C-alpha cells in the first residue's frame, strides 16, 4: 500500500500542476471534495462486497451494477442502513473513470452525481450531516478558473479525477494514511493562502495542544468545533482518543 509520505507528495505535486492560477483557498474545495467523494464511492462498493460475500475486488464494480439492476431500492436501503448513505452505480467515482476511459466523459455527470448524493441523503434520513457538502457554491464546476472554456475545464477536471483513481480510500482511511494526507494538504493550502487561511484552518500546533487537553477527559460523550472549517482540529483530537472512546462519540 502507498505510504503516507508518498501520497502526500503525489497529491501536493498534482495539485500544483493542476490548479494553475487558482487561489489555493479555492482550489482546496475541489481537490478535497473529489477526494472525499472517492472515499464515499469506495466505501459503498466495499460495503456491498462485504455484505454480498464478493472477495475479488476487481469484480465489485460490475457486481454492484448488476445487483442494483436486480434489487434497486432494496439494495440502496441495505447500504443506507449500514453507512447512513449510498452512491448509485451511475454516480460512482468509478463510473466517471469508466466514462473517461471510454472517451465519453462529461463534466455535467460529475455535477449530477454530487447533487444526487445530497438529494438522496436528505430524502432517506433527513440528516443535515452532508448538507451543502457538494453544493455549487463550494464545487462550481463551471468556474472559469478551472478553464476558460468547456473543453479546458473538462480536461482539468478529468486530470483531477485521475489523481485519486487508483487509491483505495477505505484502506487508506483504516490505516490513518488518508487522515494524515488530508491534514497535510490543508496545511499546505493554508500556507499558500496566507492570511486567508484563518478562515478554514487552525494551525496544527494549536490543534495539537487543544487535542491533548481535551483527550485527558475520559468522560467525553461529544466533541464540537465551534469554528469548524476544514475539520482538521477534530481529526487531531481523534488521534489522542482510544479506539473505544472514538466509537462511542
Residues of each region from the PLM?
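Short, small-residue-rich loop/turn micro-motifs
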Residues: 185, 189, 228, 241
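Non-catalytic, mostly N-terminal accessory regions of nucleic-acid modification and defense proteins
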Residues: 1-221
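Secondary-structure transition/capping motifs at alpha-helix termini
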Residues: 216-221, 242-249
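Class I SAM-dependent methyltransferase core
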Residues: 225
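Secondary-structure boundary/capping motif
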Residues: 221-222, 236
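Conserved SAM-binding loop of SAM-dependent methyltransferases across substrates and taxa
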Residues: 230-247
